[in-house]
């Protein structure tokens, strides 16, 4: 994110929506250390040493936000602004930055509540008020592919709406281990594709500790867990995981907004102007 003025304007509007309109609480997250902060994709993590102990550079503030909400269930919601480090082996110019700002949120409710909140955010930012949605399997059948990629994301915004909600992801897309399983291998995950790029990634969270534990160890045929074990040791990873499982779970959802992509989308829609 190179333009500080565009960054400031976009973040200011998102902060106003979540804090002033929705009553969410902004929380500090970046100062915390966590192995599960590498939860987006362990194959792209980078590490650092602090006080003689290795940690992953954070890819997301999700696990910290979840903890804040679960520890403080009376708040309407929480959000944070973090820096995401993704050591992508083959970054696509215009789509992937290895280091970029993230605006993340967590709140009470199910997938429908999540879609409603995200729709209200888009309307608040100026993208209009009419958005279409399509289930993942329906879209993959339409375009004749098993998994949707960049070309399909661009097609979605041409065929449906500038802001398209891609919903209900199947198991073959390797959903994160604590996403809510709706049954029959379908997970309550929603990506919001804006101007041809996934800009908001979100999901209803799981509440079944047994199912989450099984999913953590078995997702991607165990490769996900083994990558973390190899980097940080099985005991450290499982100790942190079990500490999370001790929290009292309730219905909730959360998401992350790539600020660079949101700025690009808002510029394309004429909602942000260069200064």
Pin down the residues of each PLM region:
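A translation/RNA-centric and nucleic-acid-associated enzymatic feature enriched
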Residues: 43-108, 134-275
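Flexible helix-coil linker/hinge segments at domain or subdomain boundaries
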Residues: 125-133
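Short aromatic/hydrophobic-glycine micro-motifs
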Residues: 22-26, 127, 145, 271
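Short amphipathic alpha-helical segments
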Residues: 6-10, 110-117
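TRNA-binding/sensing appendages of the translation machinery
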Residues: 1-44
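Short amphipathic C-terminal alpha-helix that caps PH/PH-like domains
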Residues: 115-126
